[in-house]
Amino acid sequence: MNNAVASRRAFLKLAATVTAAEFLQPEFTAGALRANAANALPEATSPDYTLRIAAAPIEIAPNHIVSAITYNGQFPGPLLRFKEGRQVVVDVHNDTDTPEQLHWHGQFVPVDVDGAAEEGTPFIPAHGMRRLVFTPRPAGLRFYHTHNRGGADLHAGQYSGQVGPVYIEPTRDSGGYDREVFLVLKEFEPSLSRGGDMAMDFLAPATEDKTLKEAGESAMKESLAKGTPHGYEVGYRYFTINGRMLGHGEPVRVKTGERVLFHVLNGSATEIRSLALPSHTFKVIALDGNPVPVPVNVPVLWLGTAERISAIVEMKHPGVWVMGDLADDDRSHGMGIVIEYAGQPGKPQWIKPKPFHWNYARFGKTGNTSPAPDETIDILFFKRNAALEGFNEWTINDVAFSMEKPAPMFHVRQGRRYRLRMRNASDDIHPIHLHRHSFELIKLAGQATAGIMKDVVMVGGYQEVEVDFVADNPGLTLFHCHQQLHMDYGFMALFDYV
């Protein structure tokens, strides 16, 4: 996506351009082979899209270049636009020396194309190719990214540049906007430190569970009393939107009276991001690509890792503005983009917004109007400080996930509705993701809500969050914190269908 603005006309031109690629049969597990064979297309069929995974330079500012593994030599990867319910073919070439996974985040796809080794998805072999055939759904803003482990290698996994947006066109478009702008937020040049996490208090409700807090703080105090330092955390040197630092990319040019639909993706490996546009508000119409029951105007957007927000901004305050992160240091190091009204001269202006707390429930139905679950599953998150060679180890119900023994922890039956009661005994905010399904938000730190469908939810420090999902997509299903540093060190679990 070289241009932030994607018009419908540009989409039609893009959709008409396809690249032929030779079909290469990958190595499969037996189950994945059967699933893929059912969707196989003739060798001569041209793909709808072709993606190439390879190292490439990214010019984040004039004469300032970083190197990263990317899709098609660019960051972010190309915008892929699909039609809901219409089968697509994507050829993925891996030009690196490392087997790769490409995860279709937020889509209801089968295991063999989901892109997670933990579920058994075949790897895209080094210097090889896989042809992926699937039916895109549900409609809305999704994305694709690597699902490889990073660990201590801060050039691998989601620390790399392997992130790209997906927009699945609904069968019916409600309209209400003049054009779309896609923004991908991403940091580069990560490094390790032992400073500990910086407290963030933007989530509402702010209610903490005393039992969870006592357990988490007690464990941390005990660890520090033994002389153990804080576990490693990741920080970054450069911050970008669409691969360019603030002031060094093309501005988003607008006209007075335009209604611009911004599709915002937090493509970070580890960071929670905020976004504000002075003198304007965002009318949030979708979270993680799913329409919200109650669209609401807000002054600030908050996005956990891998979250997406679609919001309409009415351009009615002419000027040249900075749309940027609330954190002054992050914004000064690049996390922003210029919004420029036609005919308006001058330097971009930033005005810090008033304090604002992010509450998912403001976009939902009031009260608990959702169906009762068939079963409730209790899930406890816990941190073992610096337990793995200086890195924090994370557990779900006292078990740290292991790829050597990836046994399913939870068992579900098709067609049943399950409530996940997630309890966070750490002070970290965890963006929790469930593969191949969406879930409904039910309760947020004691506050009931309904109707909000997501595939990532931020679970606040020492808080409890409840979500419901329907087991309607058989196969192994990965559940994890989307912070690379957490999922690499135990914060994952598998569901299976029985």
Annotated model-derived regions:
Residues 2-5, 15-18, 22-305, 311, ...:
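Histidine-centered copper-binding motifs that mark active-site loops
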Residues 141-143, 261, 320-322, 419, ...:
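Short, conserved beta-strand segments of beta-strand-rich sandwich/propeller modules, principally
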Residues 152-153, 319-340, 482, 487-490:
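Terminal connector regions
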Residues 263-267, 273-278, 311-314, 322-328, ...:
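A structural feature that tracks compact, well-ordered secondary-structure segments
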Residues 278-291, 397-399, 425-452, 484-488, ...:
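Active/binding-pocket-proximal capping segment
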Residues 377, 383-389, 396-397, 401-427:
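C-terminal structural cap/anchor segments
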Residues 441-472:
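C-terminal soluble interaction/assembly domains
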Residues 460-498:
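TerminUS-proximal long segments
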